Amino acid sequence: MSKKINSAILFCSIVLTYSCSITANISKYYSENQKILDSIQHSYNEQYRRRPFSIQFTDKTFTNVSIEIFTDSLKYIYEFIISEARMKDTLLKYALPVADINKLISQMASIHCTWINNLDYYVNNKKESLIYMSIRAKPFNYPFTNKKYYILTYFLQPQYYDAEGRLLDRRYRKKIRKINEDVFKRITDKVAYTISDRFR
């Protein structure tokens, strides 16, 4: 019995240490990369206002990119090798600025951001939006888990968090808000994170 108790205590200590390590690593990562992360968020937000779209890298070398472009009634999905002429022609067709999109794609590749999109959610029956970024990199391939993606969410308004830093529903402030079934934690008032086994 004593051995079982000691094993349980040891396991809990490992889990607690592991959890603290994740939080520390992600906070450090955000601090070190805040300038480029914020630049990606700002650039994507600006271009999204012109035409709703999302960007996804489809290979581990970050050379193939899929762009989803939304019109009033349809969604078009295109896949390109970065900088091929066909991508430029497609961006021009939908009135998206080629240089700005190329820069955004380059910035995403530099930090292994695999996907960026704009997601809608509702507060008091009012539609709000957030920017959702998925990042896959070696620092987040943690042991004891199959969760490989670091997810960042950028909100337009400051959010509510509980004492443990978990994102709360703005309407029911004691209720944990999940995004894509994941619980998010605070980085800043407007930026939250989670780690996940899926990028979207």
Which stretches of residues belong to each language-model region?
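Extracytoplasmic electrostatic interaction patches
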Residues: 84, 92-200
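N-terminal export/targeting and maturation segments
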Residues: 20-105
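Generic detector of ordered, mature protein regions
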Residues: 14, 18, 43, 50-57, ...
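Generic preference for well-ordered secondary structure
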Residues: 4, 21-24, 88, 171, ...
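Bacterial Sec-dependent N-terminal signal peptides
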Residues: 1-30
